[in-house]
Each structure stands twice: as structure tokens, then as C-alpha cells.
């Protein structure tokens, strides 16, 4: 499958906390799914958003806590899906000569061609936005959070 045949969805949030603090909240596939309003069963994940619902049949799932990454492959109907969530330590800000640690939380999905790719993309985009905003509200301790 070429890049031209894929629908790419990316979103990220930068929070004022350490990666270790973020990992306490995002410690595995089940807690991660819950933040994004997704419900996991043995081999499926139901993704719920303001745009509707869809069911991802997981064919592969890899949780790498030491690399702060979750990778999932599967299908939504006839649409091939590859997705991942990663956490990366960053410098959030430097003030008064002090480095303030931060964490970038990045979500990414690649959707192949299918009969309902646009609908699935809308659902996933809304779920990503919802999840990242709730994670930001929970983790971000910067003074401008409100």
C-alpha cells in the first residue's frame, strides 16, 4: 500500500509532567483505551466518539513500556488500520534558568482504502482529540491550564 492510498491521522499534546508521571496514567492498552473512550474486548476495540462508533478487530498489539509505545494493527470492516501512541520526554519550558520537563503524547493512525474510510477517519479523529484533551487536563501542571 502506498502513502497515496492511506488516510493519515495525527494528533499530539504537550503536557508539563515527566514521562514517568504520564506512564502512571497510560500504563498499558486498557488504561490507554479508556482515555480515548474505547472499550476493549478480547480481540476487538469499540471506538466511541461524537462522530459515532466503529469496531476495530485487532490482529496485532504490542505494548512496549520501556519505549513508551503502544502499536496496534487490525481492521475496521474492510479497512486496514495501523495505529500507535508514543510518549517522549521534552523540555516544556525554561524559566528563571530552570528546565521544566514535559511529555509529548503523540497518536497516529493509518487507514487503508475501504468502503467507510472517511467515516472511520472522522470517528478516530474525534476520539483522538477527546482523549488527548482529557489526558492534558489530568496531567498538565503548567500555570496556564484552565
Please name every model-derived segment.
Residues 15-17, 89-91, 109-113:
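Beta-strand elements of well-folded, non-transmembrane domains
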Residues 45-51, 69-76:
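Short beta-strand segments that buttress and anchor functional surface loops
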Amino acid at each position: 500500500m502506498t502513502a497515496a492510498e492511506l488516510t493519515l491521522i495525527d494528533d499530539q499534546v504537550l503536557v508539563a509532567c515527566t514521562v514517568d508521571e504520564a506512564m502512571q496514567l497510560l500504563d498499558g492498552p486498557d488504561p490507554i483505551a479508556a482515555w480515548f473512550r474505547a472499550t476493549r474486548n478480547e480481540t476487538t476495540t469499540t471506538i466511541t466518539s461524537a462522530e459515532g462508533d466503529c469496531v476495530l478487530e485487532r490482529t496485532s498489539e504490542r505494548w512496549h513500556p520501556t519505549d513508551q509505545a503502544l502499536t496496534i494493527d487490525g481492521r475496521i470492516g474492510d479497512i486496514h488500520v495501523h495505529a500507535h501512541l508514543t510518549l517522549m520526554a521534552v523540555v516544556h519550558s525554561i524559566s528563571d534558568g530552570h528546565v521544566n520537563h514535559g511529555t509529548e503524547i503523540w497518536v497516529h493512525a493509518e487507514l487503508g482504502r475501504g468502503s467507510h474510510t472517511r467515516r472511520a477517519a472522522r470517528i478516530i479523529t474525534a476520539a483522538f482529540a477527546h482523549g488527548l484533551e482529557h489526558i492534558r487536563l489530568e496531567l498538565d501542571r503548567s500555570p496556564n491550564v484552565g
